[in-house]
Amino acid sequence: MVPRGVTATAPGKCILFGEHAVVYGAPAVAVAIEQRMTVTLTPSTKWTVNGTPLHASKHPHIVSLMGHWGGAAALEPMDIAVSGELPPASGLGSSAALSAAFLRSLERLTDRPMTEDEAGRWAHLAEADAQQGRASPMDTSTSLLGGVVVVSNRNEGDLLHRYERSLDTSEGTLAWSIHSLAAYLKGVHLVIGNTGVHAPTAKQVQRVAERLARDPEQRQAIDAIAAITRRGLAALKSGDAEAVGHAMSENHIVLRSLGVSSEALERLIEAASPTSLGVKLTGAGGGGCMVALTRDPEATARAIESAGGTAMITAFGNPGAEASWTDA
């Protein structure tokens, strides 16, 4: 039996630019946030998760990742304690952070170091398994790598290329290039506002697809988001916080025109706007969260709370998944 335990943490994410348009080949930009998921493995006589038996239907990400190590039978039994600061089903990547943290904990436990590409592939496949075969690598890549991550359908030559990802689906093979961006915005924070309204990503993606099918001219909105994302990337590279904020607000206007905002999101966005450089929904929309770029995070957080949301303050440049030994 392993004499020591392992604790690993991994960050959630919020999307600054490109949601929905990324489905159609445009780039998208995500930021690793301060709020994290924590996984602690402690030697036990059987596999449990927070004291209850490990089960594939209840813990699909964990079971999928264990399969890459040969399954439960190939590993010493552990109690898996899962905790975190990321609300589930909110668009902040809680399941991806769980996958990234559990992967790093198994890597440390078994002393089997993985390459960056291997870690990205295994975490992405766990997300895809849990989502019945389709998942973007954005969430898992941001959780693993930390910082600012750019996902595109091509190699963005002026960014740091990390790895390629592909996934076979019923609609064909999907492919992505994963990059990191060194972004330094001084004196600003992100404030995330959670509406508390759950809106499944697949439903929102389907809603946009149906809108585009009914009115092909709406494709101009996708092209507009792609152009805004590229302007936002340029502003991030140059450290121009005002331009980043402006691009965020522009992005939201287009997303709203696609019908993926909601009354709850608009209420929080309106409340946060006076103290922010830019505001937008983050993620698939319909509910979930919004994000504000601000020089006065406390004031913005208070405004969000006063409007009925739950606020979380985060800085840029948060580290990716990491693990360490603990006393069992």
Please report, for each region that a protein language model flagged, where it lies by residue.
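Short, conserved micro-motifs enriched in small and acidic residues
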Residues: A26, L92-A97, D117, A135, ...
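DPxDG-like acidic metal-binding loop motif
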Residues: I33-Q35, L92-R112, E116, G147
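Glycine-rich active-site/cofactor-binding loop and its immediate structural neighborhood
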Residues: G287-C289
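Short helix-coil transition sites and intra-membrane helix breaks within transmembrane domains
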Residues: S90-G93, K280
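Glycine- and acidic-rich phosphate- and metal-coordinating loops
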Residues: G71-S90, M114, E118-L125
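A secondary-structure boundary/capping signal
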Residues: G18-E19, V82, S94
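C-terminal nucleotide
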Residues: V2-P11, I15-F17, V22-V23, A30, ...
